[in-house]
Amino acid sequence: MKLLPSQTDEVSLAAFGEEARALLIRHDYSGLANQFGYALAYERAPSAAIEADFLSAAASPHKVASAAHQPIAVKYFAPNDTGLFALVECTVAVGEGAAVLLELIVTGKGEGKHITVEDISGVAA
């Protein structure tokens, strides 16, 4: 999703994280794919890839003290030549004391920035 120059601040990026998290909580995989795309879709349809990766992550979730609504974390990269600008981390509750991590990545140079679902992960087996 292409961002306006005014949408790269922490508040705006956190709002995109909330939107993505809400879509995932509702299991609206098509809506999430249509809005943000999916960097790790590879040869799969983005919505099917998001669903498969979410189900895989939910099968081995992160342990959390409270599965209640966690704040969105926005982290900015140091200036670089790779085009990486920011990371948006969203904890998504999948059960009592269990959550998966939904990550969105902001890439681009200058004013041309995009936000994309980067990964959905649980605990590595």
Model-predicted segments: where are they?
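Short amphipathic alpha-helical segments, especially helix-boundary/capping motifs
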Residues: P5-D9, Y29, A78-N80
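Short beta-strand edge/turn micro-motifs at domain boundaries
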Residues: A93-A125
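Short, charge-rich amphipathic alpha-helical segments embedded
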Residues: L40-A57
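Surface-exposed, charged secondary-structure patches
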Residues: D53-A99
